[in-house]
């Protein structure tokens, strides 16, 4: 059974990983997520490397379909739609922490 994992910086998603055995499909989210993470880190005053790196986490692996590429693409598209500019701006304003 394949497993789906999302990599986050605090509560901002950055990457989707789908893995089954030795096979892996990965999708990095678009540049707007990377920019939001950088802005949120600056707002949270996490300027040194160790503080910044300590905030990365992975979601618990979730069971998913066996077409790794399709699952990775679908989840990346879902996250792109779920995190519109307003939601990312709110996350930046809160230092990357989702207040919902």
Q: Predicted segments — roles?
A:
Residues 21-58:
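Acidic, aromatic-enriched beta-alpha/helix-loop junctions
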Residues 10, 16, 33, 37, ...:
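Solvent-exposed, flexible loop/coil residues
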